[in-house]
Amino acid sequence: MQAAKPLYDYPKYWAECFGPAPFLPMSREEMDLLGWDSCDIIIVTGDAYVDHPSFGMAIIGRLLEAQGFRVGIIAQPNWQSKDDFMKLGEPNLFFGVAAGNMDSMINRYTADKKIRSDDAYTPGGLAGSRPDRASLVYSQRCKEAYKHVPIVLGGIEASLRRIAHYDYWQDKVRHSILIDASADILLFGNAERAVVEVAQRLSNGEKIETITDVRGTAFVRRDTPQGWYEIDSTRIDRPGRVDKIINPYVNTQDTQACAIEQAKGDQEDPNEAKVVQILDSPAVTREKSVIRLPSFEKVRNDPVLYAHANRVLHLETNPGNARALVQKHGEVDVWFNPPPIPMSTEEMDYVFGMPYARVPHPAYGKERIPAYEMIRFSVNIMRGCFGGCTFCSITEHEGRIIQNRSHESILHEIEEMRDKVPGFTGVVSDLGGPTANMYRIACKSPEIEKYCRKPSCVFPGICENLNTDHSSLIELYRKARALPGVKKILIASGLRYDLAVESPEYVKELVTHHVGGYLKIAPEHTERGPLDKMMKPGIGTYDRFKRMFEKFSKEAGKEQYLIPYFIAAHPGTTDEDMMNLALWLKGNGFRADQVQAFYPSPMASATAMYHSGKNPLRKVTYKSEGVEIVKSDEQRRLHKAFLRYHDPKGWPMLREALQRMGRADLIGPGKHQLIPLHQPQTDTYQSARRKNSTPAGSHKVGKDQKILTQHTGLPPRGSDGSKPWDKREKAKAEAFARNQQAAKERKEASKGGKGNKKPRQPVIPR
């Protein structure tokens, strides 16, 4: 793969003499204390500013600071006017604009398009602190404040909307966000390389419009520059000339007797064979090739062409062989350079080794930021995911090549967390990343990796060229456990269990030392139809992992349980598929409290299926394979009701559906039937989200286990508007439930005896 200039090899900007700031300034007063008269770069973000490497503005801000630039932060500005965008003054180089760690629409709306009651990235968890499509609004306000200052767009919202994309909330295809935002350049994916190069070149006096050769960037241009070879991919199913089949019984040797030849006379026949002179073609390299996608206007009006464009985009994501892409929007082209070169281990250590304070900015006082509470005692050990799940955006954003930190860097961060972060009790809440167990896993051959164009390394089966050795991760776990002051290392990131079963030693290490009672994994479904569209392994792999998990838990003398996640209404899912999943859940004693319906996020392959009804995992034509789509609100509710088969509120809908499907035999009181024949007098089922529901852990898991199928990465919300629980609060709830049960048993045991003293009730956690 092409080598890239290391991040730490750039010359430092003159302002390096100021040194690193305790926190990147959010006000003029802080700038004055630092001795700054202005900022070189101002980052505008939709999240609260937390100086922690799990937050994008902190990573980019600290990286630019290490290059010598003075970086200010405008976090969650009031977008109703330009005033907040001017509070740090005019930046010398550019505004860096991002919606935050999440797409602003996904952050605000549920999969059913209902407004969320909270925002985990805002102090106090309050909703409404950022606008819809925040990247657009912030960019426009920055232009209004300082018209001539370049705007560099980044973050996951911009990254996944860089191309003409289907917008679930408006149910239409929208322009590239670069067009709507009127930004000067867009950085997609993990943007460390691109932002450093853009900042360095702007500081050297280059104009933003001349920076067109940086990988991982998109920008607007009028036409394809000279020296580039354009590959036309704007159409599918190209019709060609069809020759009439010659009758085998006609004698064609006597051409003089042929009426066609006689009628032709001396006129030249365009179908007549001619001598062709072969000329040497100019050398065409992938580096100078650009693929022209169907225009915005075409994909807006033709869902099949939209699916085709999505397929081409995903085929051009390997940094080793990806070509540039271009898409016409009206009179201009949006040009997409190939993805950035993945960072080396040394560069990852450099980025994560910045002087982060690891706490929120002091301006927030004692206000809690729920997303920070979730990750403040966790450590990110890698980036990227080669799973390729079609509903997920991690692969599109971070890439398929795993970027790893060194053991030394990770252990140093744990020690810093132990020594600096208030409230650390010796428990590391997570040692992971996008997935728990892809650390140091890669292709056996760099040459094969360079030319590979597969969308997944583990679907339909694990690639024979993938090295599934978990030994480096096992060694890391053991080193981390041995650190002074560290009592427990938990693994909270989602586990890729199809990889884990390839290393029984890893599963044993994980189960014996790193599971806090529950381990979350994501089979997502049981049926082959939806699983193939998700690019997920079959349920048999889950069963194999479950047996290993239970075996090693028993050997360790621990009572531990798997928490499986499932998705309803994913493309490729039929009503029968959901019925079979419900039967599997009941047969295995699972009850889902929170249900996740498929959420069509921008640029995902599953979203292309949802919009077009075609499968972009295979060649797309107008006659190619169709995909079963769940779009109506009624059918989405039905699929969620199947997941919550135990909830009486869904039984009327399920009875009607089962009768329509010819499966009335599943209605009744029998053990192997799904729902009762009659409705109860009162709907007694209470969701775990409700304030008066039974706290987690109050019932012994194993019979009618409760599972959570919402894997947003955030803790469950209280339906009363209360803040999400962190892991310590969850532990308190479980302890409370155990105490309640013990008190009940003591009370029953003491009945009839003297001195029946009411046991003291423990304090109920919020």
From Swiss-Prot:
Belongs to the UPF0313 family. Residues 371-649 form the Radical SAM core domain. Coiled coil: none annotated. This is UPF0313 protein PP_4872. Binds 1 [4Fe-4S] cluster. The cluster is coordinated with 3 cysteines and an exchangeable S-adenosyl-L-methionine. GO terms for molecular function: 4 iron, 4 sulfur cluster binding; catalytic activity; iron ion binding. [4Fe-4S] cluster binds at residues 385, 389, 392. It comes from Pseudomonas putida (strain ATCC 47054 / DSM 6125 / CFBP 8728 / NCIMB 11950 / KT2440). Its cofactor is [4Fe-4S] cluster. Residues 723-735 have a biased composition (Basic and acidic residues). It holds the Pfam family DUF3362. It comes from the Bacteria. The lineage of its organism: Bacteria, Pseudomonadati, Pseudomonadota, Gammaproteobacteria, Pseudomonadales. Residues 670-766 are annotated as: Disordered. Keywords: 4Fe-4S, Iron, Iron-sulfur, Metal-binding, S-adenosyl-L-methionine.
